[in-house]
Amino acid sequence: NLFIKKGIIEVNPTLNLITPKINKKLPYFLYLQEVNKLIEAPSQKIPFGIRDKAILEVLYGTGIRVGELVNLNIGDIDFNEKIIRVLGKGSKERILPLSNPSIRAIQEYLVNRNLFNKNKFIKMNDKDSLFLNRFGGRLTARSIRRIIIKYMKIAGLNR
């Protein structure tokens, strides 16, 4: 288009070119047995294992995107209605149902999350954020991916 505007050429020589189609990769998925192994991989004897199990339960139980998960606040969860309010793509609010295992895992995590602060285990820098890192701040999408990879290895799911 630049050469046409400058009068160097009259016709765009690329108009009749056909671009090659790039095959899309199929998304990575887990079978039910593998999902169960993954969710059971975090140790429930350590505080971050409890947090990580809650993360995995919510990811599996709701189908929430990682970017949405890291932006969750405690107030986004309605335990009575068994739902999570999510601010999704394009700032659109979505309501996702919570499974009973997800609710139990979140509740157990929240009990332990409060104990962390009492024991000065972490500083609560982000009191509203649902899932905290070891410094008391909001987890990032990258840290969630690291958590998933860590437990996939522990569960023997190295595909």
Predicted features by range, described:
Residues 1-159:
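Conserved catalytic core of the tyrosine transesterase superfamily
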